[in-house]
């Protein structure tokens, strides 16, 4: 009788421990309040504005999916790539610019699901800007000038401009007087407007973001060239995110992007007007541009 009783108590204890363990595991599952889905953004615009828009979208996502999200804006594009590359990952979702996404995808740490729509298109262009009286009218004039870029991994602000400078006979490594890392496209425009840089490159048309602070920016800072088409940024997932969870988030984001409130939040963060579903193959034509230029994607991380 005593032995049976002891066995019964042992079984009850084991059951209680396993239930408690399972409950603890459930509480710590990804997307729970204690273990939120981390969504990392790059600082393509003014960081406070990007952060505010990202947080609004995350709140809407939580309401739609029941998952908890933790958003952050990295100080550099490479910071998001490194967060995805960590083991365990320090980012489960990302909104990477084109080149940074290709770099992360080549490492096997990011998979595209959504591409942003701006002005009705899932692609965009970069632009070269300078002061209206600078005397600079084409890329070949950049030699000996100070160039402002948003980030070393920014597609429209540095990667494509590098390719176009080389094509025009200007070596970006040796022929420029200086390269200024402005930190965002907004501050590239500011640098050119204030004379801290002779020329810069941004997405089209980053100048509009500064019209409130500089009412004459559209007149004083002029566009002297527009780059080839570039796939827009979007939403990417770490491969460890399950298809089920990924599908729920994608569906919710598509729903959010169709509402006025959602559009406003997406526009605040990144000037996104909508979202389209595209996988990694959407970026293949741009990969071909990089390959044709002889650019080593991973070398730029070193």
Predicted regions and their residues:
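Ligand-binding "clamshell"
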Residues: 104-116, 210-224
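Sec/Tat-exported extracytoplasmic proteins
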Residues: 64-68, 88, 95-98, 105, ...
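An extracytoplasmic/periplasmic, membrane-proximal ligand-sensing/linker region
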Residues: 32-41, 45-59, 230, 236-237, ...
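Short, low-complexity disordered leader/linker segments with a strong preference
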Residues: 1-34, 130, 302
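Acidic, polar ligand-binding/catalytic clefts
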Residues: 79-141
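Short beta-strand-to-loop elements that line the ligand-binding cleft
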Residues: 68-76, 174-184, 222-225
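Bilobed "Venus flytrap"/periplasmic-binding protein-like clamshell domains
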Residues: 34-64, 99, 122-190, 194, ...
